[in-house]
């Protein structure tokens, strides 16, 4: 599973997920992409589950790029612990995803295979997503 090798601080504040993604919202590497339509925290486990589903479906053909990285630690208190005595310890990592963010890209396969692989990955995500094609995405931005 993905997680940072080292961070400057062990714990982070929760923050807010307002607005749309200003970066990482266009296809850069592959021919097809999976784009987020809602804001959410995507856990490292969910990212890995999506990657596995896609890899298993496309088998040996094609290449997959994961465009999000879980760099935010989420802390949790032990069960049945009284209030106070500081913040809990980091339990897992999440990627903050805003609407418009490209999560996965794929190349080297046909559109039907890519669409099905992305559909399998989308089932693993806790948000609504959409399938993008590189040349169609460029036409939408112009028009």
From Swiss-Prot:
Coiled coil: none annotated. The keyword Nucleus does not apply. Pfam families: Ribosomal_L16. GO terms for biological process: translation. The keyword Endoplasmic reticulum does not apply. One of its GO terms (molecular function) is tRNA binding. Keywords: Ribonucleoprotein, Ribosomal protein, RNA-binding, rRNA-binding, tRNA-binding. GO terms for cellular component: cytosolic large ribosomal subunit. InterPro entries: Ribosomal_uL16 (IPR047873), Ribosomal_uL16_bact-type (IPR000114), Ribosomal_uL16_CS (IPR020798), Ribosomal_uL16_dom (IPR016180), Ribosomal_uL16_sf (IPR036920). Belongs to the universal ribosomal protein uL16 family. Binds 23S rRNA and is also seen to make contacts with the A and possibly P site tRNAs. HAMAP family: Ribosomal_uL16 (MF_01342). Part of the 50S ribosomal subunit. This is Large ribosomal subunit protein uL16. It comes from Thermosynechococcus vestitus (strain NIES-2133 / IAM M-273 / BP-1). The gene is rplP.
């Amino acid at each position: 599973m993905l997680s940072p090798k080292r961070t400057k601080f062990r714990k982070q504040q929760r923050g807010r997920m307002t607005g749309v993604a200003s970066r990482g919202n266009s296809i850069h590497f592959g021919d097809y992409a999976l784009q987020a339509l809602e804001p959410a925290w995507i856990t490292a486990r969910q990212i890995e589950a999506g990657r596995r589903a896609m890899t298993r479906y496309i088998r040996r053909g094609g290449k997959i790029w994961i465009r999000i990285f879980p760099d935010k630690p989420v802390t949790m208190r032990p069960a049945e612990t009284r209030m106070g005595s500081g913040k809990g310890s980091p339990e897992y990592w999440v990627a903050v995803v805003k609407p418009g963010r490209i999560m996965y890209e794929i190349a080297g396969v046909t559109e039907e295979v890519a669409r099905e692989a992305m559909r399998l990955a989308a089932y693993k995500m806790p948000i609504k997503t959409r399938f993008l094609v590189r040349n169609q995405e460029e036409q939408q931005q112009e028009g």
